[in-house]
Amino acid sequence: MSDPSCSACSGTWPDSNHFIADLGLSMAYLHDDQFFPGWTVVVFKRHATELFHLAPTERIQMMEEVSRFANMLAETFDARKMNYGLLGNQVPHIHWHLIPRLSNDPAPLEPVWCVPHDPVTLSEEAIQATIA
């Protein structure tokens, strides 16, 4: 199932240049804003807006994919904590934000959405180096 009005289904979000990996039921992309290094978005391939729209087996597999990828991010970025976000208010399509929180985190007790900052956009070379 696909929704042509959905930016995730139509391929306009996330940026395909930020593709990291096909995880099975989902795909991982480096988030556009790297103020929090390693911020990744794991996007469910099929259109669904709520976890309860998924079959139980899909929910289990999706959580396994998110968990495995979060573990890899935590190890790669030496995260002291991982943050997980599943909101869907701006992009109504199931996608998880995986945000490594590092030892030099500018606001370790705050949700990332509450930290005022200028977005950090990486060059194409830096994107490729990060996702390699």
Task: Specify the residue positions occupied by each region the protein language model found.
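HIT superfamily nucleotide-processing domains
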Residues: 1-132
